[in-house]
């Protein structure tokens, strides 16, 4: 009987995937297909929750197979992320429109990312205070305590490292190692290495233009090939979203979520407030927040379901271009946003945990000097946070260890981590796109016609198949 039910569950997922494929062939909007996949995954996951326990053999076996589609899609994206960061930064330097204002553009992007992260930290502090969250209120089961102990063991060296030592760790000693994504700070390592190559290209272009032209041709060719691979992978987005959402909802522990409901509610309240601030920033520059939401929906939906900012990078860059951002700035903003100034994972989350832990070590979390110190530490620690699953935990440990706070609390939230991480990741991606749009607007390079054109969306022929 279990085998029949397992096959039935898998067959229904494949049937919905078949419907999505049929809609693709009929050139149904990419956004609509992603939204349908998201909704279908949630509804189907809830139905499975109603009929089966999350830890039942039927769910475990069927979701293992469904996971091939979901995790397989995310792995394809992760496969291309490091090459895409590398070639995107290099190609940004080879584009004249960017190199003319390189210093100003870099400063604006980084400044926007860090400033919004500081604002996000303040919102996280406020959310923890308003909802009166405290570490002692978090229930600690066997799994949570075990995970907390594992975190303390895994990051023992990081706890001992000072903030300056943690900053030094951002500098790549072996760029080829970072291209494999082995270090937690590999993304920023690749960004730094690529930037050095880009600056070197600018110098060679002045003294040896022929050599620079050869290099530019190679970079442009590689960029075209990498982006073609990206396009092929992005066509799989609706199917990946369907599988990921089905598995996430079907295997979630609803009882644990209800037990920690106040923390979940506070987290999403903070995330929503910060997203509204993103829209206010755009409105303040004379741009329509509604247009932004409509065009950004596919990439935000993917980031929400997949929980990987790095995996969303290809769609992030494409979406910025559809919002009128020059390709060079889009590459910079998207790549920098992977490892610097993540509003959700590196801003709101560490701030909330720090405020919750502070009373247990005798620190008043509402003391102005502590709040200011916390915001500064979070802003600095936001450099180098990985754009893949686990980035928020890494960011929280960086902040807590810098404040000399215990880090085990991060393990106590394991049961609701996937649910909260979805919203955090979507906010991360939104923050990087807003930094690109804001920078383009300030430098006068934003194409307002493209931004306002409803036909300029991710629903391109490339996405249709």
From Swiss-Prot:
GO terms for molecular function: L-cystine transmembrane transporter activity; symporter activity. The chain crosses the membrane at residues 3-23, 34-54, 73-93, 105-125, 184-204, 224-246, 263-283, 338-358, 370-390, 394-414. Gene3D superfamilies: Sodium:dicarboxylate symporter. It is a multi-pass membrane protein. Keywords: Amino-acid transport, Membrane, Transmembrane, Transmembrane helix, Transport. It is found in: Membrane. InterPro entries: Na-dicarboxylate_symporter (IPR001991), Na:dicarbo_symporter_sf (IPR036458). Mediates uptake of L-cystine, the oxidized form of L-cysteine. Belongs to the dicarboxylate/amino acid:cation symporter (DAACS) (TC 2.A.23) family. This is L-cystine uptake protein TcyP. It comes from Shouchella clausii (strain KSM-K16) (Alkalihalobacillus clausii).
């Amino acid at each position: 009987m279990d085998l029949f039910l397992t096959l039935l569950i898998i067959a229904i997922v494949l049937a919905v995937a078949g419907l999505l494929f049929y809609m693709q062939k009929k050139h149904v909007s990419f956004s609509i297909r992603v939204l349908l996949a998201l909704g279908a995954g949630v509804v189907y996951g809830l139905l499975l929750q109603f009929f089966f326990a999350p830890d039942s053999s039927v769910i475990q076996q069927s979701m293992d197979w469904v996971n091939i589609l979901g995790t397989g899609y995310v792995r394809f994206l992760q496969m291309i992320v490091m090459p895409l960061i590398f070639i995107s930064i290099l190609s940004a330097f080879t584009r004249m429109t960017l190199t003319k204002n390189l210093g100003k553009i870099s400063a604006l992007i980084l400044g926007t990312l860090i400033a919004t992260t500081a604002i996000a930290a303040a919102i996280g502090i406020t959310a923890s205070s308003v909802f009166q969250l405290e570490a002692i209120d978090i229930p600690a089961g066997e799994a949570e305590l075990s995970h907390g102990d594992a975190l303390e063991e895994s990051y023992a060296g990081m706890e001992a490292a000072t903030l300056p030592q943690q900053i030094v760790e951002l500098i790549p000693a072996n760029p080829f190692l970072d291209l494999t994504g082995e270090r937690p700070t590999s993304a920023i390592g690749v960004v730094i290495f690529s930037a050095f190559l880009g600056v070197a290209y600018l110098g060679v272009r002045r003294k040896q233009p022929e050599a620079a032209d050869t290099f530019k041709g190679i970079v442009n060719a590689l960029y075209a090939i990498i982006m073609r691979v990206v396009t092929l992978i992005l066509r799989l987005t609706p199917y990946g979203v369907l599988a990921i959402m089905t598995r996430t909802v079907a295997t979630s522990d609803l009882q644990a979520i209800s037990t920690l409901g106040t923390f979940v509610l506070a987290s999403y309240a903070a995330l929503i407030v910060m997203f509204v601030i993103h829209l206010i920033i755009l409105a303040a520059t004379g741009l329509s927040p509604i247009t932004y939401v409509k065009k950004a929906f596919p990439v935000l939906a993917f980031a929400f379901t997949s929980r990987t900012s790095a995996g969303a990078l290809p769609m992030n860059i494409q979406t910025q271009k559809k919002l009128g951002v020059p390709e060079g700035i889009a590459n910079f903003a998207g790549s920098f946003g992977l490892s610097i100034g993540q509003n959700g994972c590196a801003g709101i989350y560490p701030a909330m945990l720090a405020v919750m832990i502070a009373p247990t070590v005798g620190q008043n979390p509402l003391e102005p000097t502590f709040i200011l110190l916390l915001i500064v530490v979070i802003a600095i620690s936001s450099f180098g946070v990985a754009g893949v699953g686990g980035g928020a935990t890494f960011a929280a440990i960086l902040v807590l260890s810098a404040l000399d706070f215990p880090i085990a609390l991060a393990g106590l939230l394991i049961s609701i981590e996937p649910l909260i991480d979805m919203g955090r990741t979507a906010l991360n991606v939104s923050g990087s796109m807003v930094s690109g749009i804001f920078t383009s607007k300030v430098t006068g390079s934003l194409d307002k016609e493209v931004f306002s054109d409803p036909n300029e969306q991710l629903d391109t022929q490339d996405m249709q198949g």
